[in-house]
Regions:
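Conserved HGGG/HGGXW glycine-rich cap/lid loop of the alpha/beta-hydrolase fold
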Residues: 6-61
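Active-site loop/oxyanion-hole signature of alpha/beta-hydrolase fold enzymes
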Residues: 50-91
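Flexible "cap/lid" loop of the alpha/beta hydrolase fold
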Residues: 101, 105, 112-141
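Conserved alpha/beta-hydrolase catalytic His-Asp/Glu region
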Residues: 126, 145-199
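Short beta-strand/loop motif that positions the catalytic acidic residue
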Residues: 203, 209-211
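Catalytic histidine-centered segment of alpha/beta-hydrolase-like enzymes
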Residues: 243-255, 259
Length: 268
């Protein structure tokens, strides 16, 4: 089981393929396994794909301390040093997109291009633990909350109705290594406390901003559809692409289109 000792924690990682490094960063409290459903097979054809489990998730260490997105970025940067991976394409989904922004800002030599998928720069009114999430988690139970929330946010009602097998295939992977609730909450606090809104102008790398047109379910008054507009306006060399009839999890409901858009971007 490949792990790297970085910043006093053991980080689980995998490498697939050869070529320019391509680092995939998962959403909140999610390990790297989800990328193996579609993305690893596609991009390892011509890239050195690197996935990992954040601290607090999967097979990585789970220290009971406060987490921040800066800490996650430090871990990724140290892992890249360990692997000798520089000038990489960074693909960050949701919270992973927030971590990707910090990599570009604080470790610019490590980042060739950015793909910021279904993400944002900050949560203006909701720091700490959102009350709505806490209530739902208590009422539904942790595992049911995570499962039902993933479906609600991830896909349209039409997709859920007509593709139950695909939904279950994704959930089987997502729920298999579900982290203990303590670390879900630590990740959630880290995500909600993230704020790069005043630093977007300093991101110099080309950035593709990808979002589903229906990605509007969030824990504050600004949703991912809106926050993607903020990113596009704030990052100088950026391009916004909106996927029609998609919500948060188009990497799994419409991978061919997402892959085509990303390949066009990294080819330019």
């Amino acid at each position: 089981m490949p792990t790297a000792k970085v910043n006093d924690v053991e980080i689980y990682y995998e490498e697939h393929g050869k070529g320019r490094p391509m680092v995939f960063l998962s959403e909140t409290a999610c390990d790297g396994e989800v990328w193996k459903i579609n993305q690893v097979g596609e991009f390892s054809k011509d890239h050195r794909v690197i996935i990992h489990d954040y601290r607090g998730t999967g097979r990585s260490s789970k220290p009971s301390i406060d987490y921040t997105t800066s800490m996650f970025a430090e871990d990724v940067a140290a892992l890249m040093d360990h692997l000798g991976a520089e000038d990489a394409i960074i693909v960050g989904h949701s919270m992973g997109g927030r971590v990707a922004q910090l990599l570009a800002l604080d470790y610019p030599e490590k980042v060739h291009k950015l793909v910021l998928a279904s993400t944002g720069a900050h949560y203006p009114q909701t720091k700490g633990l959102p009350l709505k999430i806490c209530k739902e988690m208590i009422e539904w139970g942790y595992e049911k909350y995570e499962r039902d929330h993933t479906i609600l946010v991830g896909w349209t009602e039409e997709y859920v109705k007509h593709h139950p097998e695909e939904i279950e295939r994704y959930l089987k992977v997502r729920m298999h290594n579900l982290c203990p609730v303590e670390f879900y909450l630590r990740h959630l606090i880290a995500r909600q406390s993230h704020d790069t809104s005043q630093r977007l102008k300093d991101i110099k790398q080309p950035a593709l901003i990808l979002v589903g047109d229906g990605d509007r379910n969030m824990t504050s008054e600004i949703n991912h559809r809106m926050s993607s507009e903020v990113l596009a306006k704030g990052i100088p060399n950026s391009k916004l692409v909106v996927l029609p009839n998609e919500r948060h999890s188009y990497f799994f409901s419409n991978p061919d289109e997402a892959h085509r858009i990303i390949r066009d971007f990294i080819r330019d």
